[in-house]
Amino acid sequence: MKSVLAFLGSVALATVLVLAVWIGFLAAFPQIGPRIGQTPMDVWAYLVDGKPAQRAQLLDGLVITLRDAGIGFAVGMSAALGGAALALLSREFERSAVPVATLLRSIPLVTLAPILVATFGRGLTMVAITGALVVFFPAFVTIMSGLRGAPRETMDLVRAYGGSETTALRMVALPAALPSLFAALRISVPGALIGALIAEWLGTGEGLGSTMLKAIPRYDYPQLWASIAVVAAASIVAYTLVGAVERVVALRFAGPSVP
């Protein structure tokens, strides 16, 4: 029960903060005007009191965007975890991989998207690569830092008893890196959504990314702001879910003393 209340409290607090920033932004820039700058109440009215077709369009777009974000998240996190493990096992791999990852991170994804579309088409492969590029670098660095922080004495003890480097990684480094792993997961959740939106803006023409893009030339600002609000809500819920899973895992490893 406490975990459920903590989860709901985190969602409520994050929602209040987002609404405060939203209202504060509109108040700080009154030149935006009420036609363009939709308030939370305007978006609520659009979602609740609007036409069923409007809600259906947003729901369909959200399902596609969550699918795209999930694909990019899974590919990016898998690559980050595998790359960080290889970097721990092989200094040569780390010296080669880190500069390449840094180079890819320094290139704006918007400039890479047309190349990805031309190379891989507008399907899920392009979506997976786009999302993975956003997710990979921060997750890779965070997880690698956590693995490097594993107790050296315990790692040496495993080796002294005949354990391989892989055994030391599995038994010592990975459990020690769980806080860093969950930090990487929390960082990557909004990143995966951003990657999905970019892929939809510039590639697939589906999902909420496409809905936002099409709303601008139609001056359909209620739909634009509603799409942004739905994406923000999905990001808050996903971020908080990762935190809830982290707490469960922490209780599993550390016992009931975890706050």
Where are these predicted regions, by residue range?
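Transmembrane-helix boundary motif in ABC transporter permease subunits
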Residues: 71-101
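Generic hydrophobic transmembrane alpha-helix motif, especially the helices
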Residues: 102-138, 145-146
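C-terminal transmembrane helix and the adjacent membrane-cytosol boundary/short C-terminal tail
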Residues: 91, 148, 225-259
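Short cytoplasmic-facing helical segments at TM-TM junctions of multi-pass membrane proteins
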Residues: 142-187, 208, 212, 251
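Pore-lining and gate-forming transmembrane alpha-helices of multi-pass membrane transport proteins
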Residues: 68, 210-235, 239
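Periplasmic/extracellular loop-to-transmembrane helix junction in inner-membrane transport proteins
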Residues: 28-74
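Transmembrane alpha-helices
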Residues: 129-133, 165-199, 225-226, 238
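N-terminal signal-anchor/first transmembrane alpha helix
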Residues: 1-25
